[in-house]
Amino acid sequence: MSKLRGYRVMLGLTQQQMADKLKISLQSYNNKETKKTPFNDKERLAIKSMVAEIKPDITIDELFYS
């Protein structure tokens, strides 16, 4: 399980719900979560804000690059 998927599950969100929050399609979100395509900066910041609710000290590097 990817780190991002783990945090999404801890937030109690489905891929569809994450896609809706980011205003992208489910297919696009799936491709990004599985690292087939990259998230853009706006999406990275939005995801960081969501994850910060459960892990306030999370960094973008930790979420997307480790």
Enumerate the predicted regions with their spans.
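Key DNA-contacting residues within the recognition helix of helix-turn-helix
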Residues: 5, 30-31, 48
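Residues within the helices of the helix-turn-helix
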Residues: 5, 16, 61
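Short amphipathic recognition helices of helix-turn-helix/homeodomain-type DNA-binding modules
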Residues: 60-66
